[in-house]
A protein has these predicted regions:
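A short, glycine/acidic-enriched catalytic loop
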Residues: 1-21
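Sec-exported extracytoplasmic/periplasmic mature domains
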Residues: 8, 23-32, 83, 92-100
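Active-site-adjacent substrate-binding region
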Residues: 15-44
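Acidic/polar loop patches that form or flank catalytic/metal-binding clefts of enzymes
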Residues: 32-36, 104, 226
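Surface-exposed intrinsically disordered loops and tails
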Residues: 35-46, 114-115, 122-131, 184-195
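Active-site-adjacent mobile loop/cap segments within catalytic or ligand-binding domains
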Residues: 37-114, 126
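Short, compositionally biased P/S/T/A/G/V-rich stretches that sit at domain boundaries
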Residues: 101-153
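Long, low-complexity serine/threonine/glycine- and acidic-rich segments characteristic of extracellular
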Residues: 134-137, 141-232
Length: 232
């Protein structure tokens, strides 16, 4: 899940606060969060027309991408009409919480929710919403253990991006010719902007095989840096 917002203040700040609330609802559903972001054209204007034109009319706006239908981890959330309706209800709940609405007839009171929104500045674009244009600064792979009886290799990944969070990783066992599916970065908290810069994972191989393993670390902008290979 991700939310696209305007790069223009104060709509950038309004959008970030709404997107933050929306991300809480999507997280509660179990979806993987990709954050609240801006996307710009080459001339610096907002890329998406609905956002650009809304801002020009002084109307706050946001585009919500609930999930990707071609992503295997997302498809369980968007298969039926009831799934789609649930997204709509969660969107409405995000709006109600953002504005701090209450209803005696419905028995709900979100008047305190608005006070829990993250603090923002109306003077400049929020750094967390700026799309990074460079690859991660570091991506290193270290062989921890190779058990040739069981065919299991344990590896340590160390990676960092000094401009935005790490988002995914994938790995290759054939020296980079083919790669696994993208895997979520372990321990990532995209809304806090935090992630562990080191984690371990294991791969299995056929007995007698000597894999050549590489890892790619991806940042929030989907740009990657590839590690040097390790021979298992």
């Amino acid at each position: 899940s991700e939310v696209w917002i305007s790069s223009v203040q104060p709509y950038n700040a309004y959008g970030y606060q709404f997107g933050w609330e929306q991300m809480q609802q999507m997280q509660d559903m179990g979806l993987f969060l990709r954050g609240v972001k801006t996307k710009l054209k080459d001339n610096g204007d907002d890329y998406y027309g609905i956002i650009r034109e809304s801002t020009s009319r002084s109307i706050p706006s946001a585009i919500i991408e609930h999930c990707h239908v071609d992503e295997s981890r997302d498809t369980p959330y968007c298969q039926t009409e009831e799934d789609w309706k649930k997204f709509g209800r969660e969107d409405a709940l995000s709006v109600a919480k953002y504005f701090g609405l209450s209803s005696a007839s419905l028995g709900v009171d979100y008047s305190g929710e608005a006070d829990a929104l993250p603090e923002v500045s109306l003077q400049s674009i929020l750094p967390a919403t700026v799309r990074d244009k460079t690859e991660p600064d570091i991506c290193q792979l270290t062989l921890q253990n190779a058990d040739y009886e069981t065919g299991e290799v344990s590896l340590e990944v160390t990676a960092a991006d000094y401009d935005c969070p790490m988002m995914y990783y994938d790995y290759s066992t054939d020296g980079g010719r083919t790669y696994s599916e993208l895997l979520p970065w372990p321990g990532l908290d995209i809304m806090a902007g935090t992630y562990p810069d080191t984690f371990t994972f294991s791969v299995t191989f056929t007995k007698g095989e000597q894999p050549v393993i590489t890892v790619r670390g991806y940042n929030q902008a989907d740009l990657f840096t590839e590690s040097d290979p390790e021979i298992g």
